[in-house]
Regions:
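Short hydrophobic beta-strand element within catalytic cores of glycosyltransferases
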Residues: 285, 294-298, 303
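A short helix/loop element that forms part of the nucleotide-sugar donor recognition site in Leloir-type
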Residues: 175-190
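A charged, aromatic-enriched C-terminal amphipathic alpha-helix characteristic of glycosyltransferases
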Residues: 173, 334-371
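Nucleotide-activated donor-binding/catalytic signature segment of Leloir-type glycosyltransferases, i.e.
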Residues: 241-257
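A conserved mid-protein helix/loop that constitutes part of the nucleotide-sugar donor-binding site
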Residues: 14-22, 195, 199-218, 235-241
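Donor nucleotide-sugar binding/catalytic pocket of nucleotide-sugar-dependent glycosyltransferases
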Residues: 140-179, 313
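Aromatic "clamp/platform" in nucleotide-sugar-dependent glycosyltransferases that forms part
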Residues: 258, 277
Length: 372
C-alpha cells in the first residue's frame, strides 16, 4: 500500500507536523510505503530526520509561500510517477487542500482524503474564495476527516458528513510529576512563589504571542511574581524579542526555542495560555491538560478542546487586564493528575494511530476489490 501525506508549509515544529510525527511513530506501518510532501522547506532538520528514521520518504517543494502552480505540478508529478493508493491531505488551509485534491485527481486514481486541522486559514487575501474551495474539498475528497466539528465546517462547509480523528497524545508521558516540576523550575531559576505561564507554538501571527507579552506587562505593573515561557521558534521571534525589550520584560520572559520533549516543561508551568487568532483543536492544549494544567484559551478555539473541565475560554476583545485576572485565578487551582481524563476522552495517540491504520487498510482493500 502506497500512501502520500500532504501538508502545507515547512517541515517544522508546527501542529500538523507534530501530529503526523506522533501518529506515524505509534502506527504499525507493516505493508505500507509512506511518503510525505510539504510544499515549503525543511526548516527543522531534527524533526525531518525523525520522519526519515521511521522510513517515511520526505519530499519538499522549496516554496517560501503557496505557489499554486508549483504545488499542483509537484503533486501531479508525484502521483503519476508513484501511483499512490491513498493521498491524505492534512491542513486547515482551504486553498491548499483544494489545489492538492485537484492535482491528486489529475495525477491518478488514488483515494483522496481531506483532513482538516484548523478553523480558519491564515491567508486572508483568499478569504472571498473560501466557499469555492470548500465545495472543491467536499466534492473531490472521497473521505472527509477533521480534528473537531468546527474544523470540519471550516474545510468542507456546514453539514458535510465527516469522521473525527482525535489529536491523540501519549497521555502517560504527560502525567504530572512534582519531582520533574521542581527539577525543571530549579534549572530555569524559577522560585517556588513565582507563577510560570506557558505557551507552546510556532512564532507566527496565528499564535498571537505578542498578546501574551502585553499580559505579562500587566502582571509586572501589578507587581505579581510571574514569568512567561514560550516554547517554539518562527519568523516573528525577532519581533517578539524587540517587544520584550520595549516592555522591559527581559527578566520575565523565557524563549528556550524548540524543545523536542515538552512534557517536563509542562510540569514546571502553573498555567497554560493560548491566545491564538485561529486554531482547530490544538495538540499543545491537549498535552497541557494531560499534565494537569489549568488552561486559558481564546474563544475562537473549539469548545471540544475542553477535556478536563479545567479550561477557560476568553475573547481577545476582553483585553489583557481580563486575561491577567483569569491567569491569576487559574494559578490558584490545585494541581491534579488529569491524564486519565484525557485518555478516557479518546485522545490517546495509540488509539488515534490504530484508527487511522484500520481506515487505510479498509480503503486499500475496497480499492483492490477485496471488500464491497
Amino acid at each position: 500500500m502506497k500512501i502520500l501525506l500532504l501538508k502545507c508549509g515547512d517541515i517544522c515544529y508546527d501542529g500538523v507536523v507534530i501530529m503526523l510525527r506522533n501518529i506515524l511513530k505509534y502506527m504499525d506501518k507493516t505493508g505500507m510505503e509512506i511518503w510525505l510532501y510539504a510544499n515549503g522547506r525543511v526548516a527543522d532538520r531534527e524533526i525531518a530526520d525523525e520522519f526519515s528514521n521511521m522510513g517515511i520518504i520526505l519530499v519538499t517543494g522549496g516554496q517560501d509561500g503557496l505557489d499554486d502552480e508549483k504545488t499542483s505540478a509537484d503533486i501531479r508529478r508525484l502521483c503519476r510517477a508513484e501511483r499512490f493508493d491513498i493521498v491524505h491531505c492534512n491542513t486547515g488551509n482551504n486553498r491548499f487542500s483544494g489545489i492538492a485534491l485537484m492535482a491528486a485527481r489529475a495525477g491518478g486514481n488514488a483515494v483522496r482524503i481531506a483532513h482538516s486541522h484548523n478553523t480558519n486559514g491564515a491567508d486572508k487575501t483568499y478569504s472571498a474564495k473560501a466557499n469555492v474551495f470548500r465545495r472543491i474539498n467536499r466534492e473531490l475528497a472521497h473521505v472527509h476527516l477533521a480534528c473537531s466539528a468546527s474544523a470540519a465546517d471550516h474545510l468542507f462547509g456546514a453539514g458535510c458528513k465527516h469522521i473525527i480523528i482525535r489529536n491523540g497524545i501519549d497521555t502517560a508521558h504527560f502525567k504530572y510529576d512534582e519531582k520533574i516540576r521542581n527539577e525543571i523550575r530549579s534549572a530555569l531559576g524559577i522560585p517556588d512563589d513565582t507563577i510560570l505561564i506557558g505557551n507552546i507554538g510556532k512564532m507566527i501571527n496565528q499564535k498571537n504571542q505578542e498578546f501574551l507579552l502585553n499580559v505579562m506587562s500587566v502582571l509586572k505593573k501589578r507587581q505579581i511574581a510571574s514569568r512567561l515561557m514560550i516554547l517554539g521558534e518562527g519568523a516573528l521571534r525577532e519581533m517578539l524579542e524587540l517587544q520584550i525589550s520595549s516592555l522591559g520584560l527581559m527578566d520575565e520572559v523565557l524563549l528556550p526555542g524548540n524543545i523536542d520533549d515538552i512534557a517536563p516543561y509542562l510540569n514546571a508551568m502553573d498555567v497554560f495560555a493560548m491566545p491564538s487568532v485561529f486554531e482547530g483543536l490544538p495538540v499543545a492544549a491537549v498535552e497541557a491538560q494531560a499534565a494537569g494544567l489549568p488552561v486559558i484559551l481564546s474563544d475562537v478555539i473549539s469548545r471540544e478542546t475542553d477535556l478536563t473541565g479545567n479550561v477557560t475560554f476568553l475573547s481577545l476583545a476582553e483585553g489583557c487586564e481580563k486575561w491577567a485576572d483569569s491567569i491569576l485565578e487559574a494559578s490558584k487551582r490545585k494541581r491534579e493528575d488529569t491524564s486519565i481524563r484525557v485518555l478516557e476522552k479518546g485522545f490517546d495517540i495509540r488509539h488515534t494511530a490504530s484508527v487511522l491504520r484500520k481506515m487505510y487498510i479498509k480503503i486499500y482493500d475496497k480499492r483492490k476489490g477485496r471488500i464491497k
